[in-house]
């Protein structure tokens, strides 16, 4: 097949090939070029990245979907994203109500068979946060 898919169907292709025995400085090539250069006994390179690509790519899919859902439902635009975190800025009087909705939207961004719990913290700045 030559690719893996994330939870939302994005593909990461693994279509570079090289000789069975790796050589320092080797540049993997597309299949036809690899066969021409090294003969018919070539192997697909970088497949060790495939498993992690599914996990990390699916996490990115979930985060992107959550960001869009949060914006569409609340109008909140995240100030910053860090890996699997959304940093949002809200007026003091609306924080708790907005937080409950943001958490719900993040947990339900993509329906899964297992729960996806979220943690939340509130603070005046990133150095002064308390768990909620």
Language model features with spans:
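Conserved catalytic core of nucleotide polymerization and phosphodiester-bond processing enzymes
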Residues: 1-132
């Amino acid at each position: 097949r030559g690719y893996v898919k994330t939870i939302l169907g994005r593909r990461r292709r693994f279509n570079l090939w090289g000789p069975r025995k790796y050589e320092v400085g080797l540049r993997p090539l597309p299949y036809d070029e690899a066969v021409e250069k090294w003969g018919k006994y070539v192997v697909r390179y970088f497949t060790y990245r495939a498993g992690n690509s599914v996990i990390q790519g699916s996490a990115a899919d979930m985060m992107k979907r959550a960001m869009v859902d949060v914006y569409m439902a609340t109008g909140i635009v995240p100030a910053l994203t860090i890996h699997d975190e959304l940093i949002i800025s809200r007026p003091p009087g609306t924080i708790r109500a907005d937080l409950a909705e943001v958490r719900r939207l993040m947990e339900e961004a993509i329906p899964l068979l297992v729960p996806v719990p979220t943690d939340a913290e509130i603070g005046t700045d990133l150095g002064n946060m308390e768990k909620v």
